[in-house]
Amino acid sequence: MGATGDTGGPRPGTESRRPGNVGNAGAAGQPVLTNPWNIMIKPRQVQRRGRRSQMTTSFTDPAISMDLLRAVLQPSINEEIQSVFNKYMKFFQKAALNVRDNVGEEVDAEQLIQEACRSCVEQAKLLFSDGEKVIPRLAHELPGIKRGRQAEEESHREAPFPKRGKVGLPGHVLSNDRAAAGMVWKPKSCEPIRREGPKWDPARLNESTTFVLGSRANKALGMGGTRGRIYIKHPHLFKYAADPQDKHWLAEQHHMRATGGKMAYLLIEEDIRDLAASDDYRGCLDLKLEELKSFVLPSWMVEKMRKYMETLRTENEHRAAEATPQT
């Protein structure tokens, strides 16, 4: 019995693990499989090889290969980009809250932040441009508006009550954006604001002069609810920044609501109506001159405005510059 067990045929388990295990040839010279389960091995191997061959031939396009690599790396890239935005997010948040404080609670600060981040991503594409394609600039990046914005900042610096500082990007970042977009930029000193002539004569201000709020003048000229556009577009206009005493009087007379720390500017009604009649606004359908709710000011406030206008006149600036001793 022991001899019979030793000389028996091969175990089925060992036979099935040996692919291509073939017994003795038959009478016709054809190989005979000793284990019928080996029939399943060869078709599976052929099918697997065919699938692998199709996969290798499907991605011979270089663009597809690079896109596959990008898809693999994209999650890591997104994490690093997000970390960069998180680093600068405090600046965007402060700026958005500042805009909401100046314009009103109807401003969606989160939407402003999202739009700013998307603009950053769009501008970052310039780093990988081929030098032939031109990415269109945003409307607020046009040269004329940039100059107006600089003039507005200059005017704010000269105001007796400085406006609350706004968060901005470093100067070298802006200069890089301008160079990348191919913009021609001139320094501020080349385009001084002329504060002279009859409109800058302090004698025109008296107790019968009518004034309007800057926010209402902005709407009257069809610039919508975006605060400050009139100052950017027309930096030559005389505007007076009301101090806390002035704002208290204006609120008591119901000319404006109590604004807390917000800036309130007063413009001369005659200047606004002259602008509305100029070629820039003649025939404009967005004009809403009924928004101009004019009023007169007390003598003590008019006197402050005269002194302020006198200090801003171009002639006095030149005299002050000439009187400065040269070292």
Swiss-Prot record:
DNA-binding feature ranges: 157-171, 214-235
Keyword Lyase part of the UniProt annotation: no
Residue ranges of the region described as Important for DNA and nucleosome binding: 195-314
Any GO MF annotation of the entry: protein homodimerization activity
Entry GO terms, CC: histone deacetylase complex; nucleus
Domain of life: Eukaryota
Composition bias, Gly residues: 1-11
InterPro entries for this protein: DNTTIP1_dimer, TdIF1, TdIF1_C
Tissue expression pattern: Expressed in thymus, bone marrow and spleen.
Isomerase listed as a keyword: no
UniProt-annotated location(s): Nucleus
Main location: nucleus
Regions of compositional bias (Basic and acidic residues) in chain numbering: 146-161
Stretch list, region Disordered: 1-34, 146-172
Region Important for dimerization: start-end pairs: 55-146
Location of the motif Nuclear localization signal: 162-168
Keyword annotations from UniProtKB, A to Z: DNA-binding, Nucleus, Transcription, Transcription regulation
Job of this protein: Increases DNTT terminal deoxynucleotidyltransferase activity (in vitro). Also acts as a transcriptional regulator, binding to the consensus sequence 5'-GNTGCATG-3' following an AT-tract. Associates with RAB20 promoter and positively regulates its transcription. Binds DNA and nucleosomes; may recruit HDAC1 complexes to nucleosomes or naked DNA.
Record remark: domains: The N-terminal domain mediates dimerization. The C-terminal domain mediates interaction with DNA and nucleosomes. It contains a HTH motif that mediates recognition of the consensus sequence.
Subunit structure: Monomer and homodimer. A minor proportion may form homotrimers. Interacts with ZNF541. Interacts with the terminal deoxynucleotidyltransferase DNTT. Interacts with TRERF1. Identified in a histone deacetylase complex that contains DNTTIP1, HDAC1 and MIDEAS; this complex assembles into a tetramer that contains four copies of each protein chain. Component of a histone deacetylase complex containing DNTTIP1, ZNF541, HDAC1 and HDAC2. Identified in a complex with KCTD19, HDAC1, HDAC2 and ZNF541.
Protein's recorded name: Deoxynucleotidyltransferase terminal-interacting protein 1
Organism: Rattus norvegicus
Gene: Dnttip1
